[in-house]
Structures are given as C-alpha cells and as structure tokens.
C-alpha cells in the first residue's frame, strides 16, 4: 500500500502552508518538449474547490493546484487559494497561478515585475516541483505575458519547471508567438471548444508533450489516454473518491453529477 499520511495545503493569512512535506527531489529539466521530469503521466487540475485527494495513488497521479489568482489592472492584486487540499504523501505537485487582465489593464514595467514576483512566490511553496501559469492573453497582451515568463524563468531555482496552459489556437501555429517563450512545456486545453472541436492541429513543439482535457467531455478525454502525452485532467467540481479510483486504474471517469 502507498503511504497515506496527508499533505494539507490551506490558507494561512495571505499565503499557503502545508502540514507535511512532500519527499523526493526534482530532476532538472533538459528543456526537451516531451514528458520530462519525474511527474506521473496523469495530472489532476485542482481549481478553487475543497479537495480531498488522499485516495489518489501518487505513483499514478499528480496534482496541479490553483495557488493564487493575479488580477492585473493599473496595479496588481493577488487572491490566494482559499480552499483546502488534502493529498497523499509523496504526490507530485505543481502550483498554478491564474492571471486575469482587468478592463483598465496597464502593461508597464511595474505590473510586469510584480506579476512575475507573484508567480515566483508560488514556485517557492514547499513541496512543489514547478509552476504553471494560466493566462488567456489577448494579442495585445502577449508582449506583457512573454516578458513575465522571461522574468519568472530568470528567477526560478534550478530544477523547478516552468509551464503554461495554452489555447489550442496558439498551438496550431508552427511559427507562432509561442516559439520563443522560455517555458519547459505548454498544455493545450482541448475542452470548452464548442463548435471549434477538431478545427486545430498541434504544430507548436512546446505543445506536443502534454494535453489538457475535461471529464465532462469524455470523448476527447478518453482519446487522450491512447497517446504518449502527459494528460492534465480538469473536473468542473471537486474530485470524488470514485473518480480517483477510476483514475488510479488508468481510466478517465465521467462527471456523473452534471453541471452546477
């Protein structure tokens, strides 16, 4: 049996803390665009929901948990995670930082620097192996985003991975704006595509090693398990013990509870 002493990330004041450390060292990435590092093949996205993942098998599953949201306007404000996560000891973990641009978004040296600092703070959480940035940047915001990622890369400790989520349309461009980004990998989000399902193929090398799917879109989610990519799985509500059991066994569960 896998050890079940829980790791508990929760909010304490303005930051996150953990109750028991994760063990094991990061393997330094070589910047290859495939499945690098020691992460398991299937990673659970854990958004702003109370999560109990203690029945997950850390040999099979990892977690990318929302650590904080960053709102960029004339200045930068930060909202830390407010919901508790319980995980089994030794589970591979990655901090996710969600960036959102307000109507009065300002791109300047100060907002770029502060945003990068927030991402770096999340990367310093004990037990996390790296950081994933989630920002649906408009074309006019891409220079801002690229510079934030460059500053984060420059400040990351050796061995910590830097990843990003990516719209599928970004990944469809072979020589697009992503080609010079200093990230280890980008995760194309193959869900919530509506009528655009099947429109885009992946041509950007950064996007070739991973895929993001949702359990309430089972056709695409199940197909992802037949490939060789790392699979990030999103659930619209908190993960259940039943769903985790299915994932432990190598299958994608259905979202039987329906939408909110």
Indicate residue ranges for each PLM-predicted region.
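Sec-dependent bacterial lipoprotein signal peptides
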Residues: 9-15
């Amino acid at each position: 049996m896998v050890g079940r002493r829980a790791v508990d990330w929760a909010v304490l004041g303005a930051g996150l803390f953990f109750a028991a450390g994760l063990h094991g060292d990061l393997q330094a990435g070589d910047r290859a665009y495939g499945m690098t590092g020691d992460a398991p093949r299937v990673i659970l996205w854990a958004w702003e929901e109370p999560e109990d993942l203690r029945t997950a098998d850390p040999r099979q599953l990892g977690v990318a948990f929302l650590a904080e949201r960053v709102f960029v306007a004339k200045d930068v404000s930060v909202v830390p995670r407010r919901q508790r996560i319980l995980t089994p000891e030794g589970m591979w973990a990655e901090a996710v930082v969600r960036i959102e641009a307000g109507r009065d978004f300002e791109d300047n040296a100060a907002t770029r620097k502060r945003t990068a600092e927030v991402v770096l703070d999340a990367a310093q959480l004990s037990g996390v192996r790296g950081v994933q940035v989630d920002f649906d940047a408009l074309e006019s915001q891409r220079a801002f985003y690229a510079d934030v990622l460059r500053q984060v890369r420059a400040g990351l400790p050796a061995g910590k991975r830097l990843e990003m989520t990516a719209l599928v349309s970004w990944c469809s461009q072979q020589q697009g704006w992503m080609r010079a980004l200093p990230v280890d990998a980008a995760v194309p989000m193959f869900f919530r595509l509506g009528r655009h399902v099947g429109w885009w193929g992946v041509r950007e090398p950064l996007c070739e090693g991973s895929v993001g799917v949702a359990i309430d879109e089972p056709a695409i989610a199940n197909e992802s398990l037949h490939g060789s990519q790392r699979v990030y799985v999103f659930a619209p509500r908190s993960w259940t013990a039943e769903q985790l059991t299915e994932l432990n066994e190598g299958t994608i569960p259905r979202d039987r509870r329906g939408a909110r």
